[in-house]
Amino acid sequence: MANTLVQDDSVEWMDLGDGIQRKVMAYDAGMMIVKVAFEKGSIGTLHKHPHTQASYVSKGIFDITIDGKTERLNAGDVYFVPSDKIHGAVCIEKGELVDVFAPMREDFV
């Protein structure tokens, strides 16, 4: 799916349950960009993966935990997760994250 131009409405949301949906927007072997929509109160449980992750809060308010430290982030804020660091998110106000992974998440396709 290494399309160079992707229109938002051309990609379907995948329902992950518990008020969370995901759209894999584009990827190649080296990188992937994903939108994740959260309902208020939804929890992205603590987890880790070998991929480096950078995330942009495009909408809403989230409590983001990385390596045991939690901070509240608002629309326009960014966070970075190094490889294999435990992290997660709690949606305080309905919102959306734009996640970039390097390399791509093979488990998402």
Go through each PLM region and give its residues.
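Structural motif
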Residues: I61-D63, T70, I86, E96
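Histidine-centered metal-chelating micro-motifs
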Residues: I43-G44, D63, Y79, S83-G88
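Short acidic-glycine-tyrosine-enriched beta hairpin
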Residues: K69-S83
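Glycine- and acidic-residue-biased ligand/ion/polar-headgroup-sensing regions
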Residues: H51-F62, D67
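Conserved short histidine dyad/triad with adjacent acidic residue
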Residues: V34-K48
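A cytosolic small-molecule/anion-sensing beta-strand core signal
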Residues: S58-K59, N74, E93
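A short, N-terminal "cap"/entry segment at the start of jelly-roll beta-barrel domains
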Residues: M1-G30
